[in-house]
């Protein structure tokens, strides 16, 4: 109950101090800025709730994020944009799942302590992402892919809807 009181105090302070705090635009901006972290936090919630720790989350995000433009800009994806879009979303998710499986094997099968196992990929994953990108910012343009980050449904950011949907699924799954 203490957290709810703290949240209520923060909301009340923001309402009092910030003139436009309660409008849809502010909510949309906050949702778009927080959604990625919220989605990652959902996964971490499951790890922590089960008594584990995962230091490799940021590195896994970096590897998946580095892989998406590589897949999308490949010859196959350029010749078939629909397939490229699907592959640039699904393949990085699969690679992220395989990274998690690697950590799981280290912990569950080989008996490595979770903090050590995930620290291994924390360090190596950042290196893998650097190698994949040659240390450069990767960019590409596709209206459908861009829509995931900048689009709106009913005035609310798409990534906010995705985070909300995943939150509901996780909340249902842990009940």
Give residue ranges: language-model regions.
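Transmembrane helix-bundle core of multi-pass membrane transporters
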Residues: 110, 114-175
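Interfacial loop-to-helix junctions that mark the boundaries of transmembrane helices
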Residues: 1, 24-32, 79-90, 147-161
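Hydrophobic alpha-helical transmembrane segments
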Residues: 4-5, 30, 38, 59-63, ...
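Single transmembrane alpha-helix segments in multi-pass membrane proteins
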Residues: 10-81, 105-115
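A cytosolic-side transmembrane-helix exit/cap motif
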Residues: 46-47, 78-86, 133-143
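Alpha-helical transmembrane segments within multi-pass membrane transporters and channels
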Residues: 78-122
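Structural signal for alpha-helical transmembrane segments and their membrane-water exit/capping regions
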Residues: 6-22, 50, 129-133, 170-175
